[in-house]
Amino acid sequence: MADDSASPSPSSASPLQHHREALKSSVRNTAASRRREQAIAIGKERREALIRAKRVCRAPISGSDEAEMEEGDMVVDEEKACLEAKTAHAVEELKSALSIQGKGVQKKKIEALRDLRRLLSQPEVPLVDTAIKAGAVPLLVQYLSFGSSDEQLLEAAWCLTNIAAGEPEETKSLLPALPLLIAHLGEKSSTLVAEQCAWAIGNVAGEGAELRSTLLAQGALRPLTRLMFSSKGSTARTAAWAMSNLIKGPDPKAANELITIDGVLNAIIASLEKEDEELATEVAWVVVYLSALSDRGISLIVRSSVPQLLIGRLFSSENLQLLIPVLRGLGNLIAADDYMVDSVLTVGHNIIDQALSGLIKCLKSDNRVLRKESSWALSNIAAGSFEHKKLIFASEATPVLIRLVTSMQFDIRREAAYTLGNLCVVPTGNCELPKIIVEHLVAIVDGGALPGFIHLVRSADVDTAGLGLQFLELVMRGYPNKQGPKLVEMEDGIEAMERFQFHENEQMRNMANGLVDEYFGEDYGLDE
């Protein structure tokens, strides 16, 4: 993911003058930047991993007549040329059915649409390009005309859905169909037709920012919001999925527009309150993008029941596809608005206990994304009050974080390091060095975390190395009986710091040299 934001370089005059802010900054002060970068990266992540940005519709929508029919055996081993010929013929049949009149014409239209749809739905040979070159899209637009039967509209929208699931240029071919697809999202359309049109729109929105802008300009947001209220689970899920594709950014305009639509927050809450985990998953992605891109959205969401509902899911669910957006949405909210930590995650209330339990579950997961995102969320909570620090420190999170900072991948080490660092300091509220919570520092160092921080000092990433240096300063300044420098030396910390002696980054050079001079100068070791 391209969602890692950098912490400010430490001050050369006072290495930890703003230590709380320095530790906190990578996840709070520059949280908006990281959240926006996430919104860009998530689309690619969903396409390649658990939740695809574009989806082929192979099975009939529940409730349609086709769901009750035998699909018939497709001959899957036909040669590509034969299937392409069938596709071109199916498009010709579409054209022919539009030109005839009289008895049986409607049946012929449906049969022609269904033949094309079945060919576009089969997974063995991609036939979208063949259909487009044969002229399918403008014909399908005609089949979407108002006054057509629901069955015809459904089949036409289904064909367009699978064309939109193709390659980028294939998806762009749907531009002439977008106004009618959006129009059929309206209240006068049947639920089946509206759902299929939402699916097609979701595929188009999943392709890129240019097509999303077109959909927004043509008014797709409001009818999709209405569909999220549908009592039919698959319709609400499809609408939420299409919505998340539509607002994913990087332009925040769509997210800011969405949060102003009457009822959208109520729709999100109502969806999260249902037992439907698939619906909750899609709606959680909507929350992810709103919390990544819209400051107004963040303010409204944190003051609603959404955080409590997300925490409930985090605490109770073992569904990875649900946990990822739930955790990321919570992480965004915690990073973006102090209200989340100060007024929602109040120590002594059940909600913080549930949140901490859910975060620890994710920390211990084998899934890399869950470990990283839970560390990020915890680092922000740990940057809160002394009570929050004590609660996290006393929990199972601390030994797990120590393990992560010493043995995991680089990005997870860094997030875990921010959390552990924040557990060790209390801000003074002025320009002085932060007060060290000695009990926490000693336990974390004695628990084996120091080698992990020295490893960070050796990082090629300057900001990560700065984080490691900041923690070494805490150890050397705050470990009892002036044993901190010796502990750092025993783990080859001096050598790690000396690599910055002639470093091109002046702030890092001054910080590292200042620490070496202060703690390992001429008087070092004389007390022994």
Swiss-Prot record:
**Induction and repression of expression:** By dark in green leaf. Down-regulated by light.
The record describes the protein's role as: Binds specifically and directly to substrates containing either a simple or bipartite NLS motif. Promotes docking of import substrates to the nuclear envelope.
Subunit comment: Forms a complex with importin subunit beta-1. The whole complex, most stable and composed of importin alpha, importin beta and NLS substrate, is referred to as PTAC or pore targeting complex.
Record organism: Oryza sativa subsp. japonica (Rice)
An example Gene Ontology CC term for this record: nucleus
Name one molecular function that GO assigns to this entry. nuclear import signal receptor activity
Q: Give positions of region: Disordered.
A: 1-36
**Family that this chain belongs to:** Belongs to the importin alpha family.
Q: Found in which tissues?
A: Expressed in root, callus, and etiolated leaf. Low expression in green leaf.
The GO biological-process annotations, alphabetized, read as: NLS-bearing protein import into nucleus
Which keywords appear in this protein's UniProt record, sorted alphabetically?
Cytoplasm, Protein transport, Repeat, Transport
The residue intervals holding the ARM repeats read 125-165, 167-206, 209-248, 253-292, 294-335, 338-383, 386-425, 438-477
Compartment(s) where it occurs, according to its Swiss-Prot or TrEMBL record: Cytoplasm, Perinuclear region
Name it.
Answer: Importin subunit alpha-2
InterPro entries of this UniProt entry?
ARM-like, ARM-type_fold, Armadillo, Importin_alpha
Skewed-composition ranges (Low complexity) = 1-15
